[in-house]
Amino acid sequence: QSTVATAVMAAQKHPCEPRSLTLMAGPIDCRINPTTVNKLATDHPIEWFQTNLISTVPFPLPAWGRRVYPGFMQLAAFVSMNPERHLDAHKSLFRHLVEGEDDEAEKIKTFYDEYFAVLDLTEEFYLETVAWVFQEMRLPLGRLKHRGELVDCSKITRTAILTVEGERDDICSVGQTSAAHELVTKLRPHLRSHHLQPGVG
């Protein structure tokens, strides 16, 4: 979304166009090195996602009646991709606690505090993302529109762009984020940078 917003602002010559943009592990072009997540998105029609993954928030919760992709379902999907890794991490946590290795235990606890911090996604946002990003690849194919106008990333000429990817990322694989550099065709080389972090997933 930040890439699209920057492109729209650049096309409008908006005075608040950002000076820099950092893209971290966000899918710009899902055709590159498709992952299990990409395969799931392309193997099912959008109606499947609406039927199987969207729920209504129950009463008396504050957002009751709202249709969402629940955080607990997102988390279950993430964990199910690498169950052995998560099981091993919790075994290590237990071992560190038993052996009094508090610093090591705290690292694992801190990671999972962040990992488990997921929010419900609204139905509209989630289904649009699946359709437009993962199924139709609208941005890299030049088909994404904002208020009826095609989004043209070549309009980005003043915003420096840094892309960051993890070598072992199995959700947004190597190349899917750095594909942004292929879209900003008029951005000068000194305003582009890419970082691939080895061993990170």
Question: How would you describe each model-predicted region?
Answer:
Residues D170-A179:
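Conserved alpha/beta-hydrolase "acid-adjacent" motif
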Residues I156-T157, L162-E165, D169:
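Short beta-strand/loop motif that positions the catalytic acidic residue
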Residues R168, R192-G201:
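Histidine-bearing beta->alpha loop at or near hydrolase active sites
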Residues T6-E124:
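Alpha/beta-hydrolase-fold enzymes
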Residues P15-C16, C153-R158, V184-P189:
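Short, conserved loop/helix-junction motifs that constitute active-site signature segments
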Residues F134-C153:
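Active-site nucleophile elbow and catalytic-triad environment of alpha/beta-hydrolase enzymes
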Residues S2-V4:
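Catalytic nucleophile loop
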